[in-house]
Amino acid sequence: MTKRIRAIADNNPMAQLLMTIPGIGYIIAMYIVAEIENISRFPSYRRMGSYAGLIPSLRASGCKERRGKITKQGSSYLRTALIEAAQVIPRMKKSKLSVFFRKRIVRAGYQSAIVATAHKLLQYAYYVLKNQMPYSEEYPVSA
């Protein structure tokens, strides 16, 4: 089965672009391709994050706004695949994503840092697919 998935991923240009992102292999790339279908469905990476359920919930009262846990609305398959891909990032040595993870873990703890890294992976996936260019450490994604 994995040989067939790998063969499909090798012939899919979207999967090839996604596999240039650290932490995303051919299985995760095919999950993303299957769930997203067409990148033009999403006008921004925030909409794509909302689709995956990786955005924080907002609670507002008066003038105060608080961000809570992720909403978990949207595609649970995509969210799970990205969180699995993010599990690899802490083991990387000198990657922009691993630096991002290490900064987050100090502030928020391990699991929250993994979810934030999964969201960052989704942002990179959006830019890679939208621009049709391989991943580069210089992508302008905010923290």
Residue ranges: model-predicted function:
Residues 1-143:
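A detector of single, family-specific signature residues
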